[in-house]
Amino acid sequence: MNPHDLEWLNRIGERKDIMLAVLLLAVVFMMVLPLPPLVLDILIAVNMTISVVLLMIAIYINSPLQFSAFPAVLLVTTLFRLALSVSTTRMILLQADAGQIVYTFGNFVVGGNFIVGIVIFLIITIVQFLVITKGSERVAEVSARFSLDAMPGKQMSIDGDMRAGVIDVNEARERRATIEKESQMFGSMDGAMKFVKGDAIAGLIIIFVNILGGVTIGVTQKGLAAAEALQLYSILTVGDGMVSQVPALLIAITAGIIVTRVSSEDSSDLGSDIGKQVVAQPKAMLIGGVLLLLFGLIPGFPTVTFLILALLVGCGGYMLSRKQSRNDEANQDLQSLLTSGSGAPAARTKAKTSGANKGRLGEQEAFAMTVPLLIDVDSSQQEALEAIALNDELVRVRRALYLDLGVPFPGIHLRFNEGMGEGEYLISLQEVPVARGELKAGYLLVRESVSQLELLGIPYEKGEHLLPDQETFWVSVEYEERLEKSQLEFFSHSQVLTWHLSHVLREYAEDFIGIQETRYLLEQMEGGYGELIKEVQRIVPLQRMTEILQRLVGEDISIRNMRSILEAMVEWGQKEKDVVQLTEYIRSSLKRYICYKYANGNNILPAYLFDQEVEEKIRSGVRQTSAGSYLALDPAVTESLLEQVRKTIGDLSQIQSKPVLIVSMDIRRYVRKLIESEYYGLPVLSYQELTQQINIQPLGRVCL
């Protein structure tokens, strides 16, 4: 074949749309025009080839979505097969000849016996119709329904992963497209299985019509005896039916494989999946070998055959069991190697890479980013911490904090570490510990006062100060029922972790708002507030926007109301270039939320106030530079101010209603920085952040 011919074939292969159109037109002409036997043989061979190729594709695809065009292919192949049946029927009735393949199927395959042919044809048709097609149709129907019902949950899961930073926007878009494609695929398969079902029914009808029509034509028009006509036309009709039903059966098997395929991330072809899952159960093979041996001992059964099978299955199970045991021992040795030592991230990474890169020490190490959020727990607590309950608690905490602050916190990594003290746990941000605590085996954590526990006669042990202004106590689990009856709040080990973690996340929330997260929040709003997003990006650079959001969440102000925040940025962004002051204007635009948050839904706000002289002293200490503003008070003045704050406010943990501190807007941020080391939980508000409906309940005034 010369290069010109190859180029011509390549051009034809590139125009797949034209090839499909030609095929569909050919199907129509096959129903109308009579075809010679040679052409029929070619078309029948093509039909068989298509069915075999489709079956092989179904076996080797990793997921049904890799052959999402199959419903349309099923329609085309069904039409092609029916058109072929019409053409062969025409040739059988007109010329008593439908080509060499039909004749061979009628004589050689069924031995020229009409009864045998009918029986084989009926068996194939019944298997296809009642077994394969019926089951595949039901599976497709259920898959379509479940796929549609699961779409909202999958979409929410994708959104959660994207907020947590597990995936980026592009991957989230791809996953959503995959879910939509999967739903359409199974919905189409639900309808396409009706083609296979109808094809089987049509095959049954066609064969009986052909026999009846052939005998009638043979007797009335060709002068044949009834028995002779029946023998001639029935053999050809059975051959035609077999030629049609064998590819139809292969197509039905293909459809069944595709709709019943359960795909996962580590899926490969069907044979590999079946092989891996079968050999993963060596005990089942050993038991199967014993059962086969017992079958061989039954009188009358072929003993040698069953003994050989029992030997093969049993030996296979034994060898797989030995191999699995060796792998488990190797994994345990590797795990003990990785978990020994201090458990520090650097040491652990070194252990892993030294084993993986043995003999390749000269190669460059792969870049590994730090884990954003990590909980290290003493390995002895692994059984006490129920995995499912802990996972539910962690998901609940992330969800609650997102609804409260609007911060897309990342996924939480839990690691059991043998190098830690008994019951100890560490909470780390970017693999740097920021909080620690202890879990006491057989005890519950209680936050109630000592007097309540003593009143109930419950013995206790004083726990650590997990939070600055909260005392905790350990109570034995045997008093759990008494605590429940007394309606005293207590925490299990899983709840202690999540409770402590929630406070840590709230304290360090601003660390989880970066440029990437800010970009994500803007992209989430583009669909409904496109013009607002364009305007705010024109006025406020992304870096300044990020800093503003960090300052808001750093003081426990939710950023879920992004529309109001962005509107305020547009309003004040051109007038005010100082990020600190711009944040104050944005806070004033959130006054309804702030008042509702700190007044607990009431119109009365318990508050401490600063004397005018104190405010002037702070105002005089503010310094403006090109890099921004800061508070520069004399150390003696700073200590004097803090001492007056301590005298006025005292111990916040002893105050039932949570108060706030109210100062002027221009010094609010500096006052917050001044007192946050000692009064982190005391919100500092400005008068501009109060609505008209709020009534201030003064609790005290800080004076010099």
From Swiss-Prot:
The keyword Iron does not apply. GO terms for cellular component: plasma membrane. One of its GO terms (biological process) is protein secretion. It is a multi-pass membrane protein. Signal peptide: none annotated. Coiled coil: none annotated. The keyword DNA-binding does not apply. Keywords: Cell inner membrane, Cell membrane, Membrane, Plasmid, Protein transport, Transmembrane, Transmembrane helix, Transport, Virulence. It is found in: Cell inner membrane. The chain crosses the membrane at residues 20-40, 42-62, 67-87, 112-132, 200-220, 238-258, 290-310. Its main location: membrane. Changing L337I: In plasmid pYVe227. Pfam families: FHIPEP (PF00771). InterPro entries: FHIPEP_1, FHIPEP_3, FHIPEP_4, FHIPEP_CS, T3SS_FHIPEP, T3SS_HrcV. Belongs to the FHIPEP (flagella/HR/invasion proteins export pore) family. Could be involved in the secretion of the yop virulence proteins. This is Low calcium response locus protein D.
